[in-house]
Amino acid sequence: MMSQTFIKKEGIAQSFLARYLLSEKCGNRLKTIELLSKECELSVGLMQAALKSLEQAQAVGIKRRGRNGSFLAQINHKLLLEYADIGNVVCAMPLPYTRAYEGLASGLKILCAGVPFYFAHMRGSDIRIECLLNGVYDLAVTSRLAAEQHPENKDLYIALSLGTQSYTDRHRLIFRHGEMESIRRVGLDSTSADQKIMTKQYFAGKDIELVEVSYHECLNQIIKGHIDAAIWNVGQGHKLIAQGLMTQLPDDSECFIKASEAVILARKDNIPIQQLLHTMVDRDLLLTHQQNVVAGIIEPVY
């Protein structure tokens, strides 16, 4: 009877090989078993047995060419992911205060059925990105603007981009009726990377005072007269005119467009998670689900 120790070690070898193979493409020359066993610190025999079991399960097909080496001929990403032993997947999401965010969360949950997929909802894209980079979470949803402007974006990988207005509607300048020319105090939530970047660009060269305000309080603070204006995503259900407020849509500057696009981020070195997303999530199906949630056709489940 095969020992439990051998079975456990073969499982480790399978997981190691699966993670390695997920980063390879068909036609690529593979590392030798000797080199892989050295990297994994397991015997050559164990690595050979693990590779054979992956081939027998039809997770991969290997073409062996003697001295020229072995090449990846066929790959089944879904099967390999089962062997990769990824475990729970946690995605950092914005707080679900819009139907668009709820639609994304619900769509991801449904498309990743069969994988233990969970969400951590938190305010502030910089915080979500930091948690991703520090290994606290596996994925993070932010705007394209926040992802590209983050100081450590070289360590980020945009695993999926969803197009304009998939994250928010276009942001607008919100101010009290008839008071656009007298804007001096501008609300800013320092935890919102998007709002910081857009506010800085919109008011460049203008004599204003930035006032720290929670993003969700911007409208109330303008109405009460504590601030004069804010760059804000109007979204659904806000009767601005009835509240004595006006909006102005900024020019089609690149940063305002990028702030409306949702992207799903992974760490650049986390190939299995990137492959998981590519394998499980169909972009068009995700967007259709989101649009149906926004339209009220279906209720979000996440």
Each predicted region: which residue ranges?
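A short alpha-helical element within helix-turn-helix/winged-helix DNA-binding domains
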Residues: 27-40, 54
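HTH-adjacent hinge/linker in prokaryotic transcriptional regulators
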Residues: 52-104
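Short alpha-helix C-terminal cap/hinge motif
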Residues: 99-120, 201-202
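C-terminal regulatory/effector modules of DNA-binding transcriptional regulators
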Residues: 123-125, 133-302
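Generic structural signal for residues in well-ordered beta-strands
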Residues: 60, 117-120, 208-210
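Short coil turns linking two alpha-helices in DNA-binding domains
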Residues: 41-50
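Short, hydrophobic-biased segments on the C-terminal half of alpha helices
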Residues: 51-52, 129
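Extreme N-terminal segment that seeds HTH/winged-HTH DNA-binding domains in transcriptional regulators
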Residues: 1-32
